[in-house]
Swiss-Prot record:
GO terms for molecular function: GTP binding; magnesium ion binding; uracil phosphoribosyltransferase activity. It comes from Nocardioides sp. (strain ATCC BAA-499 / JS614). This is Uracil phosphoribosyltransferase. Belongs to the UPRTase family. It holds the Pfam family UPRTase. The gene is upp.
């Protein structure tokens, strides 16, 4: 597994405003959207392309286009939905699948409650959208779900990550014969006793959409 922390002043600027507890939900959604687009630029450096011949107003030339099968973008519900538009801005022709996962706040274990994905993901590059890589349980379960269906290349885009979550991913994905890359805006200090990232930005889903009881 490879972890890439994006070092860019605009990324740091937007992340700082996301962290601020005074940032309201509409502003938080806009900043998250902008930040994901910046992260997506780094995350798609290995996106597969194929050659294509085109004719410019001056002469014929050879360029590239996204290879088939097209990439699959998979937001983890619900907070991952807040990252979808920012990702699709760079990959408008990608397919979108959905994976609903929930974390038990007592055991910190993740379980799947909904999915809308192709049955066969053989040969597919998958981009998983999960704003907070905290304990790592949700993302590990999502990656296993995708690889069980044949995905052969997975990149996860996270607004924030914690060292404990990355360590758990390394452990749970050990022996997995599929390249996995984590792209994040920051590696924070630690998790607290409730499994939240410190200093973090709070609950991403609540801050995106408001608290739903």
């Amino acid at each position: 597994m490879r972890t890439h922390v994006v070092d860019h002043p605009l990324v740091a600027h937007k992340l700082t405003h996301l962290r601020n507890e005074e940032t309201d939900s509409p502003t938080f959604r806009r900043l998250a959207d902008e930040l994901v687009t910046l992260l997506a630029y780094e995350a798609t450096r290995d996106v597969r392309v194929e050659p294509i011949d085109v004719v410019t107003p001056v002469s014929p030339t050879t360029g590239v286009q996204l290879a088939k099968p097209r990439p699959l973008v998979v937001p983890i519900l619900r907070a991952g939905l807040g990252m979808l538009d920012g990702m699709m801005r760079l990959l408008p022709t990608a397919e979108v699948g959905f994976l609903g996962m929930i974390r038990n706040e007592e055991t910190l274990q993740a379980s799947t409650y909904a999915e809308r994905l192709p049955e066969d993901l053989s040969g597919r590059q998958c981009y998983v959208l999960d704003p907070m890589l905290a304990t790592g349980g949700t993302l590990a379960a999502a990656i296993r779900f995708l690889t069980d269906r044949g995905a052969d290349h997975i990149t996860a885009i996270c607004l924030l990550a914690a060292p404990e979550g990355c360590a758990r991913l390394e452990q749970e994905l050990d022996g997995l014969d599929v390249p996995v890359t984590i792209v994040t805006a920051a590696m924070d200090e630690r998790l607290n006793e409730k499994g939240y990232i410190v200093p973090g930005l709070g609950d991403a889903g609540d801050r995106l959409y408001g608290i739903v009881g």
